[in-house]
């Protein structure tokens, strides 16, 4: 194998491995109360980050503290088993003003986070 061919092979290998690593990295998006709408906003802060981890574990992340909160059962199980450190979602989830005693729905956020998987 000549030098030029070897250089091309190494470059191709590096591109393949770096793109595979990029595909495996969890996706993260930021959503704001303004973007989602005040009537659907479920959190006690103006914006949060959403992420999907391997295995479809969905989390909300507080952008100022980087504390994470499980958004679905898969994420809850990861926290319960000690695989991931997180706080309960109820810490940042607000009450539903139209339904006393109930919290705002997490469905719009679960839907958005699932698109990252």
Protein language model annotation of sequence segments:
Residues 1-9:
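Positively charged n-region of N-terminal signal peptides that target proteins for export
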Residues 9-18:
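Sec-dependent N-terminal signal peptides
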Residues 19-23:
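N-terminal Sec signal peptide cleavage junction
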Residues 25-66:
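N-terminal secretory signal peptides
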Residues 26-27, 44, 52, 74-79, ...:
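Contiguous interface-forming segments/domains that mediate binding rather than catalysis
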Residues 59-93:
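Flexible, solvent-exposed short loops/turns enriched in glycine
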Residues 82-117:
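C-terminal partner/receptor-binding element of secreted or periplasmic proteins
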């Amino acid at each position: 194998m000549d030098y030029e061919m070897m250089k091309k092979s190494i470059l191709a290998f590096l591109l393949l491995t770096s793109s595979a690593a990029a595909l495996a990295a969890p996706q993260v998006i930021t959503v704001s109360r303004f973007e989602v709408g005040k009537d659907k906003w479920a959190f006690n802060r103006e914006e949060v980050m959403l992420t999907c981890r391997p295995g479809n574990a969905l989390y909300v992340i507080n952008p100022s503290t980087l504390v994470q909160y499980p958004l679905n059962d898969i994420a809850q199980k990861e926290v319960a088993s000690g695989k991931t450190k997180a706080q309960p979602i109820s810490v940042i989830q607000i009450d539903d003003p139209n339904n006393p005693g109930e919290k705002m729905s997490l469905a719009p956020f679960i839907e958005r986070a699932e698109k990252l998987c």
